[in-house]
Amino acid sequence: MNDRVTRLLLGALGALMFAGMLSQQAGPGGQGADVTFIKDDQTATIDCNRNAVSITGDDNKITVKGECTRLTVIGDDNEVKADNVNEVSVTGDDNKVAVNTVATISVKGDDNKIGWKKGAGGKKPEVSNIGDDNDITQD
């Protein structure tokens, strides 16, 4: 191989290794990598550890423990219970999400039920509701 091709390949390999290291770095909360869960018909417990959690699938029963920067639920008929979340985003139909403390709630879909106990900082959460028959209430 000539020197130019070798340098290009080594440069590309170095860039890929650097990108891989970045993807393993701490998430926005600084504690570890964000969590992505992509499955159907599962029961699971996820440790948030001050990062973002994304749940994609249908008919899951998920418990999210600890503080989260963001909780994203995409799919239908999921049941999610979470401790403390800065931002909850739900896209789909017939999901049930219960959160202890939350600052922002965004819902896109129909027939979702989002319950929260406390707003962050003692304030009611900001709510965006796009869809029909969504129930977003304080428990």
List where the protein language model places each region.
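Bacterial N-terminal signal peptides that target proteins for export
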Residues: 2-12
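Bacterial N-terminal signal peptides
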Residues: 11-20
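Extended beta-solenoid/beta-helix repeat architectures
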Residues: 22-139
